[in-house]
């Protein structure tokens, strides 16, 4: 593709999505952790400006959801809830409350999951919220004043 660079995702499915502003970040454990990513499996995916970052987060969450062993409730149920919210957002049916719940679920999984998969599954969501928040906001359906 001839598109312009938008983001790089490091560390495999539970790594973070890093915007162009951080391209000069050294690829080491500490530096990646400072910007919300991980070294993980050492994978690197490069995305151009045609990439929908909310859908990217949904794609990686679906993978983590499918790979969850189901032993702990935070990961087993949390990844399903997060995937459902991301799917609604991608379809343009999400709400601001969905985004707030997504952030709460990210914190819950990181703090309470028993293994590395559950603890790192929120990384793509957290980094896309941090660096591409406007894409989430653009997907929120028009809400009536309540």
What is the role of each PLM region?
Residues 1-146:
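Redox cofactor-anchoring modules in respiratory/redox and cofactor-processing assemblies
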């Amino acid at each position: 593709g001839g598109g312009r660079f938008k983001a790089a995702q490091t560390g495999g499915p539970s790594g973070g999505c890093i915007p162009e502003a951080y391209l000069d970040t050294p690829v080491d454990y500490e530096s990646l952790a400072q910007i919300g990513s991980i070294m993980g499996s050492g994978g690197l995916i490069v995305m151009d400006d045609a990439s929908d970052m909310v859908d990217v987060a949904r794609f990686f969450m679906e993978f983590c959801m499918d790979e969850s062993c189901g032993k702990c409730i935070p990961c087993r149920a949390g990844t399903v809830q997060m995937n459902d919210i991301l799917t609604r957002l991608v379809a343009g049916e999400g709400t601001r409350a969905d985004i707030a719940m997504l952030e709460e679920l990210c914190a819950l999984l990181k703090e309470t999951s028993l293994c590395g998969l559950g603890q790192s599954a929120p990384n793509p969501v957290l980094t896309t919220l941090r660096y591409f928040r406007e894409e989430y906001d653009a997907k929120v359906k028009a809400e009536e004043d309540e």
